Amino acid sequence: MSKEKALESALSQIEKQFGKGAIMRLGDQEAAHDIDVIPSGIIALDVALGIGGYPKGRIIEIYGHESSGKTTLTLLAIAQCQKQGGTAAFVDAEHALDPKYAKLLGVDVDNLIVSQPDTGEQALEIADMLVRSGGVDIVVIDSVAALTPKAEIEGDMGDSHMGLQARLMSQALRKLTANIKRSNTLVIFINQIRMKIGVMFGNPETTTGGNALKFYSSVRLEVKKGGSIKDGIDVSGNEIKVKVVKNKVAPPFKQADFELIYGEGISLEAELIDLGAKYNIIEKSGAWYSYKGKKIGQGKEKSKEYLKENTAERDEIERAILELLLPNKYSNKDSNDSPKEGSKIKTKVNPAVTQDELI
């Protein structure tokens, strides 16, 4: 028997025993190269991720300091998933989910599946059961630091439980990974930062739960709080910086900058002005911003107010940015948000911008 026939026989036997799709040639189906995504709800982050959102069938880790915007990012992803008709689940190990804030960010809280487990084992088992059901599109676990092992909860204060949480995460992820891929579910772990003791050189910061999550994650996002945004003398929000420190589906190390406004969420208008000015979709001359030769505001705040009031122009600018920065996902596609038929968007790319920046 030739090698080719022996291989075909083996492939056929594997498919018969384990089911269709258990093994295949990478070029057998075009779909193998197309990754399903759930948009992040933030244009700059979709661009930084390289594929227009979070990849489905993968594990994502979002980590950062307290109050840096980690939970906000996951709630925005849940809102986008629900807008596409998907089902979302939130495993609230921290017991800190605010339904009012989630609703403010666009989450359909009435249809959001929520669990508040007592132990880390229970939380991960619930997540695994949801994934295996195949009926959930996104599962968020908030957070790894709050996944307390049962032995620690039942023990006394001060008892030593070295490496218990790390072993729990390692065991759970080995079990979860195959199920996540099979069901094409997006699973997001929120994680916190701790300081290593005795580190003299290099970064002393590390994440909780051991190293397993770092290895199993296809994408790792580091969230940092930037400067404050002021409305007069009052602080109305702060800048958020998200760095893609690991990416298995696109080039890593891209960064997304955007504004988080207290009581409102992510400022879409600020994103459009920053990205529009960077890629010459919006012209900037001194403090003035213009679109198609028409002045829209003096200074960023006035321009943001203009775009809030003029939604048609805002949607047109958004579409132009998406078509320029994510052409594979948005170019030549009909959309309810796109300008009316017959109108053309002319985009002039800044010649100083390299092709790498457009990815």
Curated annotation (Swiss-Prot):
Disulfide topology: none
SMART domains (UniProt xref): AAA
UniProt key word ATP-binding: yes
Basic and acidic residues compositional bias, start-end: 331-344
CDD domains hit by this protein: RecA
Keywords: ATP-binding, Cytoplasm, DNA damage, DNA recombination, DNA repair, DNA-binding, Nucleotide-binding, SOS response
InterPro entries in the record: AAA+_ATPase, DNA_recomb/repair_RecA, DNA_recomb/repair_RecA_CS, P-loop_NTPase, RecA-like_C, RecA-like_N, RecA_ATP-bd, RecA_C_sf
Segments passing through the bilayer: none
GO cellular component: cytosol
Gene Ontology molecular function terms on file: ATP binding; ATP hydrolysis activity; ATP-dependent DNA damage sensor activity; damaged DNA binding; single-stranded DNA binding
One family name in Pfam for this protein: RecA_C
Location of this chain's protein in the cell: Cytoplasm
List of residues binding ATP: 64-71
GO biological process: DNA recombination; DNA repair; SOS response
PROSITE patterns: RECA_1 (PS00321), RECA_2 (PS50162), RECA_3 (PS50163)
UniProt cross-references to SUPFAM superfamilies, sorted A to Z: P-loop containing nucleoside triphosphate hydrolases, RecA protein, C-terminal domain
Spans annotated as Disordered: 329-359
UniProt family annotation: Belongs to the RecA family.
Function: Can catalyze the hydrolysis of ATP in the presence of single-stranded DNA, the ATP-dependent uptake of single-stranded DNA by duplex DNA, and the ATP-dependent hybridization of homologous single-stranded DNAs. It interacts with LexA causing its activation and leading to its autocatalytic cleavage.
Protein name (database record): Protein RecA
Native species: Francisella tularensis subsp. holarctica (strain LVS)
Lineage: Bacteria, Pseudomonadati, Pseudomonadota, Gammaproteobacteria, Thiotrichales
